[in-house]
Curated annotation (Swiss-Prot):
Protein source organism: Xylella fastidiosa (strain M12)
Enzyme class at the top of the EC tree: translocase
Name of the protein in its database record: NADH-quinone oxidoreductase subunit H
GO cellular component assignments: plasma membrane
Catalyses which reaction(s): a quinone + NADH + 5 H(+)(in) = a quinol + NAD(+) + 4 H(+)(out)
């Protein structure tokens, strides 16, 4: 399915390499833009999808104007860009502006090692898993600085909640990925996907043997992105908007962009680690070549990855529309007393499954 794309990209790559070192730099910048621009556009349409889907769940219409609601998010962005950025009188203005950038940067930098297909990846790093853990844990520093620089008790309280929540669930997420690493025998994300390939389709995915780790990673991902029902960081009924309470205009839009970019990132990572990434759920069930379209259905490709991502991204919206917010003590109890012990136990179970040959791909 990605052959046509590679046929276009490869000649373009060779053309850039003809310019020497400057060509390598330009090609790298182009690859970054090929990820960043679609990501920003995806966030805009994701916001529209969220408003539409929640509207349908609540028996409402959702956005209906500005291109039948399709371009409502773009209108909101333009509105925010032209709004004045207000600074609290006692705020630290430099850190106040830098904080949303520190939150946004890791959410974009993490995409450097995320593969979309066998050859569609910006950097096929062998330590991609460690890189992801580092990048996804950096965003909280921007939130903490935003709460401190705002000089507001509501913002500071939201920032402290975020710090405690990230510390609690980052451990569980890391332990869940240790199980994935043991099962795949690699820290390379492309190799983790290919470790789930086989002739049994979705039965070869890590979803089945690592199901408890899948649940832990999914729920922890929701908590890491501060989304409902774990949105105590910006609980409107308690602390107004948390660390974002003093923000307006374009700097507020940066926080908004970082949050939704992280949601899409977590949806990608769940699909890669547990659902075989771009692999087809019926891969290996049919042999032989029939047609390019039918061959793609059982051989897999990046559209399969996008379908899986759409499911998990929509699940975020379903959670928001369906579940009430947890109390802060309930969130802490779930992270420390349930998820961390469960992941530790299942790491040992995963090692036993690899040792006994139940999982064939681990080394």
């Amino acid at each position: 399915m990605n052959t046509w794309f590679l046929n276009v990209v490869d000649p373009l790559h060779q053309w850039f390499l003809g310019f020497g070192d400057i060509g390598v730099v330009l090609w790298t910048v182009l690859k970054i833009l090929m990820i960043a621009i679609p990501l920003i556009v995806s966030v805009a349409f994701y916001v529209v999808w969220e408003r539409k889907l929640i509207g349908w769940m609540h028996v409402r219409h959702g956005p209906m104007y500005v291109g039948m609601g399709l371009f409502q998010a773009f209108a909101d962005v333009f509105k925010l860009l032209f709004k004045e950025v207000l600074y609290p009188s006692k705020a630290h203005k430099v850190i106040f502006v830098i904080a949303p950038l520190l939150t946004l940067a890791p959410s974009f930098a993490a995409w450097a090692v995320v593969p979309f297909d066998t050859k569609l990846v910006l950097s096929n790093a062998n330590v991609g898993l460690l890189y992801l853990l580092a990048m996804t844990s950096l965003g909280v520093y921007g939130i903490i600085l935003a709460g401190w620089a705002s000089n507001s008790k509501y913002a500071f309280l939201g920032a402290m909640r975020s710090a405690a929540q990230v510390v609690s669930y980052e451990i569980a997420m890391g332990f869940a990925l240790v199980g994935v690493m043991i099962a795949a025998g690699s820290l390379n994300l492309s190799q983790i996907v290919m470790a789930q390939a086989g002739s049994s389709g979705f039965f070869d995915w890590f979803l089945i043997p690592l199901f408890p780790l899948f649940i832990v990673y999914w729920v922890s991902g929701v908590a890491e992105t501060n989304r409902s029902p774990f949105d105590v960081v910006e609980g409107e009924s308690e602390i107004v908007a948390g660390h974002m309470v003093e923000y307006s205009g374009s700097v507020f839009a940066l926080f908004f962009l970082a949050e939704y970019a992280n949601m899409i990132l977590v949806s990608f990572l769940i699909s890669i680690f547990f659902l075989g990434g771009w692999l087809s759920p019926i891969q290996g069930w049919v042999s032989g070549q029939v047609s390019p379209l039918i061959d793609w259905v059982w051989n897999g490709g990046w559209p399969w990855l996008l379908l899986k991502v759409l499911f998990f991204a929509s699940a975020y919206i379903w959670f928001r529309a369906s579940f009430p917010r947890y109390r802060y003590d309930q969130i802490m109890r779930l992270g420390w007393k349930v998820f961390i012990p469960l992941t530790i136990v299942w790491i040992a179970v995963t090692a036993l499954m690899v040792f006994s040959g139940v999982i064939q791909k681990g080394v």
